[in-house]
Amino acid sequence: MPIQVLPPQLANQIAAGEVVERPASVVKELVENSLDAGATRVDIDIERGGAKLIRIRDNGCGIKKEELALALARHATSKIASLDDLEAIISLGFRGEALASISSVSRLTLTSRTAEQAEAWQAYAEGRDMDVTVKPAAHPVGTTLEVLDLFYNTPARRKFMRTEKTEFNHIDEIIRRIALARFDVTLNLSHNGKLVRQYRAVAKDGQKERRLGAICGTPFLEQALAIEWQHGDLTLRGWVADPNHTTTALTEIQYCYVNGRMMRDRLINHAIRQACEDKLGADQQPAFVLYLEIDPHQVDVNVHPAKHEVRFHQSRLVHDFIYQGVLSVLQQQTETALPLEEIAPAPRHVQENRIAAGRNHFAVPAEPTAAREPATPRYSGGASGGNGGRQSAGGWPHAQPGYQKQQGEVYRTLLQTPTASPAPESVTPALDGHSQSFGRVLTIVGGDCALLEHAGTIQLLSLPVAERWLRQAQLTPGQSPVCAQPLLIPLRLKVSADEKAALQKAQSLLGELGIEFQSDAQHVTIRAVPLPLRQQNLQILIPELIGYLAQQTTFATVNIAQWIARNVQSEHPQWSMAQAISLLADVERLCPQLVKAPPGGLLQPVDLHSAMNALKHE
């Protein structure tokens, strides 16, 4: 058989194999078109489970007369116009093939009118070449689509349709999902002339919960925990059923939406399941209705023929964000309120969060300043006249006692500046200018070695080895523990009994290294890590660290810091001159012993005399 171009109708029927799976698929595509057109009311009329008639009527913006023929053509759409639009899709439809595909396997009629037009127009396609005929019609502003005799010209597809009741149940489920996605739209569903579902548009939270109960049932509404979780461009809201009271009937309620688009995404389901797994039985599933809002540039919706799945550019971030949002709500449900104290405790000192250069991890913290006055004055200040607990005229609730005459002598004494005594001269011998320096960086060799010039000699320094020694110094606690940096999204890992025992045994030492965690029955949650580890792949590093600890019988902070320093990934696969100079400056400041006595593998002298002698003999 020779290669030939397929006729338009046959090409559309092939595309319909992906777009039009059953009558519910037609309803989904057409209702989503109505929502994209700005409709606030959509009426869906079904006959014989959709096999005989599917009629979708909306009050959207309508379609202009000159665009009706294009609306039934393949790859014609008003949703996108460029690659930039495709990479940031905000509409439900965008491919421009739904109407063409549906019209190729049914008798489709499109009637529409815009607010600017005096009359409506009707279009339908027929024949082998799918020629479109347009004629006047009577219709209010909006659009009506009638799909008659679905699969009438493809008997094989029609044979695979189920019973009328089954097909209508699939349509009913689609409308339920859409009703949960768009609370601001009225949806009316009729079957064989009888109104079956009526979801009125709602705006207030209480009304939304009533619609939620009408769709998901009262048992779900009674156990639903509201979620409102946000970070940057990510927002998670909705409801999740309390896992402690989840029944078999509730487990069928699993609705998830990404930017208003209904989804069945395994990554999202896994994150929710992981957050609830400690409270669910082996045969139980979580029940939820969740809405994820994300920057359209960070999600690709064009990865599934029926648009049931999406692909996130930062899937791990999205997974952990959803997991933490659901987990926080479940934890709030189980937490009990702590009794309030009369006097607030002193605020915990948090060290300044800067890029690691070494000094911030080991600097002695200054005394923290009081964030607020205590509820009751700690000192009476002598005879205060009983005014310490009253508000001042300015309205300050905790005004301090004024200047007392009895304290005048004390204040004057404190204000006197003592005469400075001359400091004794230092007897420390002056250091040579090059004694605490590796020398001058000449160039980078091989991507990971620095060629140095020092006191007339040339040396080759391994930058990865120097970086490892620097990391070890940054991770080794000095007079105070290493500053812990809280993780935005804590890392939750499953551990064995031996690993859990090792972690509990080493918990205090890990705390000195800036690694903070909490453990439960079978899991450990990493809450904070030291700053040098913030950019590491903790999904790999932390499990390896736990495995290392489980193999040890005794623990020491130096050994743990050394292991971490050897196993962290370098941030510089290829070193530049600026990066090498910055690294050596940090090493010279934090690891001066490396300059005095370089360890093996760090420095290698370069013998220039042999090369010079070889040149002289030529």
Curated annotation (Swiss-Prot):
Recorded GO MF terms: ATP binding; ATP hydrolysis activity; ATP-dependent DNA damage sensor activity; mismatched DNA binding
Region (Disordered): 366-403
One of the record's GO cellular component terms: mismatch repair complex
Compositionally biased tracts (Low complexity): 366-381
InterPro entries listed in its UniProt record: DNA_mismatch_repair_CS, DNA_mismatch_repair_MutL, DNA_mismatch_S5_2-like, HATPase_C_sf, MutL/Mlh/PMS, MutL/Mlh/Pms-like, MutL_C, MutL_C_dimsub
Pfam families tied to this protein: DNA_mis_repair (PF01119), HATPase_c_3 (PF13589), MutL_C (PF08676)
Domain of life: Bacteria
HAMAP family, A to Z: DNA_mis_repair (MF_00149)
Family affiliation: Belongs to the DNA mismatch repair MutL/HexB family.
NCBIfam families, per database record: mutl (TIGR00585), PRK00095.1-1 (NF000948)
Protein name in the entry: DNA mismatch repair protein MutL
